[in-house]
């Protein structure tokens, strides 16, 4: 039962991160289309945001492995 719970938790975290990444990237592209001169700044900020969003599923996978090793 622990394996199922851990895999569901990791899957939900990955799903949430993919939705979040899509929203961040789409808004960044909208901003680049409106202000092309800010493209470099927006791109750098986007990479930082995507990195922070991706930290959540990575941590959930680590927690899932910790739960499975009990």
Swiss-Prot record:
Record-marked site positions (Reversibly protonated during proton transport): 54
Membrane-crossing residue ranges in chain numbering: 3-23, 47-67
PROSITE patterns tied to this protein: ATPASE_C
Entry GO CC: plasma membrane; proton-transporting ATP synthase complex; proton-transporting two-sector ATPase complex, proton-transporting domain
Protein name: ATP synthase subunit c
The keyword Hydrolase is assigned to this record: no
Record GO terms (molecular function): lipid binding; proton-transporting ATP synthase activity, rotational mechanism
Keywords: ATP synthesis, Cell membrane, CF(0), Hydrogen ion transport, Ion transport, Lipid-binding, Membrane, Transmembrane, Transmembrane helix, Transport
Keyword Aminoacyl-tRNA synthetase: no
Membrane-topology descriptor: Multi-pass membrane protein
Family: Belongs to the ATPase C chain family.
Function of the molecule: F(1)F(0) ATP synthase produces ATP from ADP in the presence of a proton or sodium gradient. F-type ATPases consist of two structural domains, F(1) containing the extramembraneous catalytic core and F(0) containing the membrane proton channel, linked together by a central stalk and a peripheral stalk. During catalysis, ATP synthesis in the catalytic domain of F(1) is coupled via a rotary mechanism of the central stalk subunits to proton translocation. Key component of the F(0) channel; it plays a direct role in translocation across the membrane. A homomeric c-ring of between 10-14 subunits forms the central stalk rotor element with the F(1) delta and epsilon subunits.
Subcellular location per the Swiss-Prot or TrEMBL entry: Cell membrane
